[in-house]
C-alpha cells in the first residue's frame, strides 16, 4: 500500500494492524460468549459440556472468519494438524471438524488444571488417551493418500513452467513492462516444445484485441497441432460484460480457446468492497471491479488429464475447490495454480 499505492506509511501500518485486529475479533467474541454462557448457564462445574461449548464457539468463529468479508479461511486451526495425530479425521469432518476436535481437547486439558475441577483432570487424561488411540488406529488402518487401482498406472504429463520475472511495478507500464512481457512470453511460447506449457497470471498483460497485429492469431496457430497445449494467464472481457482475470487454454480441436475466469477476487486488488471507495481513493491506485467467474467451472482436458486452473490465492478456499468435484465424471485429476509471481 505504501510502496505501490502511495499511501502514507503510518496509515499503511495502521491498515495492516486494523486487519489483524479484525481477524482477532472473531476469537475474542467467541471467548467472551464462552465466559458469558458458562456463567449464565451454570456450566462452570461441567468441564465436558464447557469444552464442547468452547469448541462450538471456536468453530463458529472460524466459519465466520472464513466466509464473511470475502473470507480468510487459510488460518483455520485444523490446518495446523495436517501432519499430526488428528489428520486422519479430515477426510470425515473436514478442516473445521478437525479444529473442533482440537479445540475441545485443548479446552479439556486447560480445564483439567483448574483447582476446582478435579474430575476434569481425569476427563482430560481420558480424552488424551482416546486421541492417541484414535491416531494410532488411523495411521494403521487409513491410507490418506489415494493410490491408483491395481494394474492402473498413474498419468504423467510433462510440463514446462514459464516465468518472465517482469517487476510488478513495471508489468502494466506501456512501453516497458508490457513490451517486455509480450516479447519474452511470445518468444517462449513459440520456441518451447514441451507437451504442456504453463504461464503465470496475466502473463500477457493486455486483452487479446489489444495485442499487436497478428500476435494472438500466431499463438492460436502455434498450438493448433495435436502435440502441444498451453495454459496462460490473460485478462478477458469487455466493458459491457465486465473484465475477468482469466486463464486460457490453447490446444487443437477447439472452436474457441478454453477459458477459466477467476471466481474469488482479491479485495482492493480486483474489486472494491462496499463502503471502501474512500480507502481506494486514499491509496491512489486506479482500481476497477473485475467480474467473477462461476464456481465449478469445467477443467482443461489434455492427454487424459482434467486440469483445473485457479488463480493466485484461490487455492486457499477449499470449499470452492471441492465444488469442482461435484460431478465425479468431470472431476479434476490435477489443479494448476497460477499467480502473478509463480504457478
Positions of predicted regions on the chain:
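Class I S-adenosylmethionine
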Residues: 131-136, 175-176, 336
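Membrane-proximal, cysteine-centered motifs at transmembrane boundaries in secretory-pathway
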Residues: 317-320, 324, 331-334, 338-343
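Membrane-embedded alpha-helical bundles of multi-pass enzymes
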Residues: 1-144
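Generic detector of well-ordered alpha-helical packing
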Residues: 63, 67, 95, 202, ...
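Active-site catalytic loop in hydrolytic enzyme cores
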Residues: 2-18, 41, 66-93, 243-318, ...
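Asparagine-centered polar/low-complexity signal
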Residues: 106, 165, 245, 337-340
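Soluble catalytic regions of membrane-associated enzymes that act on cell-envelope
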Residues: 139-271, 292, 297-315, 321-328
Amino acid at each position: 500500500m505504501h510502496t505501490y499505492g502511495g499511501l502514507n506509511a503510518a496509515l499503511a501500518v495502521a491498515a495492516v494492524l486494523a486487519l489483524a485486529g479484525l481477524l482477532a475479533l472473531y476469537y475474542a467474541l467467541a471467548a467472551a460468549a464462552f465466559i458469558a454462557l458458562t456463567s449464565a448457564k451454570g456450566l462452570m462445574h461441567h468441564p465436558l459440556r464447557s469444552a464442547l461449548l468452547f469448541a462450538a464457539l471456536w468453530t463458529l468463529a472460524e466459519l465466520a472468519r472464513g466466509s464473511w468479508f470475502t473470507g480468510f479461511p487459510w488460518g483455520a486451526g485444523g490446518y495446523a494438524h495436517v501432519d499430526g495425530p488428528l489428520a486422519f479425521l479430515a477426510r470425515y469432518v473436514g478442516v473445521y471438524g478437525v479444529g473442533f476436535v482440537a479445540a475441545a481437547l485443548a479446552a479439556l486439558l486447560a480445564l483439567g488444571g483448574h483447582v476446582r475441577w478435579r474430575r476434569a483432570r481425569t476427563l482430560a487424561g481420558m480424552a488424551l488417551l482416546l486421541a492417541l488411540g484414535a491416531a494410532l488406529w488411523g495411521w494403521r488402518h487409513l491410507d490418506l493418500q489415494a493410490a491408483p487401482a491395481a494394474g492402473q498406472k498413474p498419468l504423467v504429463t510433462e510440463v514446462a513452467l514459464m516465468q518472465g520475472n517482469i517487476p510488478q511495478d513495471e508489468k502494466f507500464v506501456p512501453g516497458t513492462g508490457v513490451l517486455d512481457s509480450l516479447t519474452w512470453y511470445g518468444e517462449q511460447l513459440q520456441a518451447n516444445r514441451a507437451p504442456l506449457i504453463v504461464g503465470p497470471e496475466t502473463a500477457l498483460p493486455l486483452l487479446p484485441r489489444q495485442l499487436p497485429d497478428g500476435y494472438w492469431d500466431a499463438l492460436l496457430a502455434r498450438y493448433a497441432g495435436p502435440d502441444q497445449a498451453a495454459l496462460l494467464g490473460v485478462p478477458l472481457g469487455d466493458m459491457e460484460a465486465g473484465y475477468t482475470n482469466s486463464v486460457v487454454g490453447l490446444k487443437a480441436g477447439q472452436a474457441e480457446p478454453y477459458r477459466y475466469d477467476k471466481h474469488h477476487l482479491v479485495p482492493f486488488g480486483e474489486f472494491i468492497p462496499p463502503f471502501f471507495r474512500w480507502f481506494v481513493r486514499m491509496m491512489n491506485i486506479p482500481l476497477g471491479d473485475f467480474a467473477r467467474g462461476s464456481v465449478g467451472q469445467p477443467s482443461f482436458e489434455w492427454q487424459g488429464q482434467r486440469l483445473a486452473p485457479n488463480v493466485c490465492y484461490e487455492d486457499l478456499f477449499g470449499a470452492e475447490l471441492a465444488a469442482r468435484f461435484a460431478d465425479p465424471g468431470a472431476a479434476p485429476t490435477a489443479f494448476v495454480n497460477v499467480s502473478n509471481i509463480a504457478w
